[in-house]
Curated annotation (Swiss-Prot):
Protein known as: Large ribosomal subunit protein uL18
GO biological process: translation
Oligomeric and partner information: Part of the 50S ribosomal subunit; part of the 5S rRNA/L5/L18/L25 subcomplex. Contacts the 5S and 23S rRNAs.
GO annotation, cellular component aspect: cytosolic large ribosomal subunit
Family: Belongs to the universal ribosomal protein uL18 family.
Stored SUPFAM superfamilies: Translational machinery components
Keyword terms of this UniProt record: Ribonucleoprotein, Ribosomal protein, RNA-binding, rRNA-binding
GO molecular function (one): 5S rRNA binding
Transmembrane region(s): none
Function (record text): This is one of the proteins that bind and probably mediate the attachment of the 5S RNA into the large ribosomal subunit, where it forms part of the central protuberance.
Length: 118
């Protein structure tokens, strides 16, 4: 068993450190993906609450599978609409340890098109 950190853990720590340095007072758009679904939340860390969220498990997204870039794009568009309705337009993108590629990139692009700035 390896004593070192996995590549995923290393990326996660590096991203979180950069978020703390650059994030300032803006909420963060946190993304989590699994093999079947993708989840996005806009989190206000100062208040300790979730401002807006969307995932492929939502009732309005039930017809779409979460394992595609199209489904991730619809989640990005939905979370952007909900965040704008809550009064949030500027966020910091928190990809966690996930590579900015594929479904994560599709979600980010759709959130930008939906009006979120990051």
């Amino acid at each position: 068993m390896s004593k070192g950190l996995s590549l995923f853990e290393r990326r996660r720590r590096r991203v979180r450190t950069a978020l703390r340095a650059r994030g300032g007072l803006r909420p963060r758009l946190s993304v989590h993906r699994s093999g079947r679904h993708i989840y996005a939340q806009v989190i206000d860390d100062e208040a300790g609450r979730t401002v807006a969220s969307a995932s492929t498990l939502d009732k309005d997204m039930k017809g779409k599978t979460g394992a595609t870039a199209d489904a991730a794009a619809s989640v990005g568009k939905a979370v952007a609409e909900r965040a704008k309705a809550a009064g949030v337009t500027q966020v910091v993108f928190d990809r966690g340890g996930f590579l900015f590629h594929g479904r994560v990139k599709a979600l980010a692009d759709a959130a930008r098109e939906g009006g979120l700035e990051f």
